[in-house]
Amino acid sequence: RGSNLTIHPLRNTNDIDY
């Protein structure tokens, strides 16, 4: 995870590392 941390949490297009 943590592929794209720049992606907004609203758009889950990429793996967001929470």
Curated annotation (Swiss-Prot):
It is found in: Secreted, Extracellular space. Its EC number is 3.4.23.-. Belongs to the peptidase A1 family. On the 2D-gel the determined pI of this protein is: 4.0, its MW determined on 1D-gel is: 61 kDa. It comes from the Eukaryota. GO terms for molecular function: aspartic-type endopeptidase activity. One of its GO terms (biological process) is proteolysis. Glycans are attached at residue 4. This is Pregnancy-associated glycoprotein 61b. Its main location: secreted. Highly expressed in the placenta between day 60 and day 100 of gestation. Keywords: Aspartyl protease, Glycoprotein, Hydrolase, Protease, Secreted. The keyword Electron transport does not apply. It is an enzyme of class 3 (hydrolase). It comes from Ovis aries (Sheep). GO terms for cellular component: extracellular region.
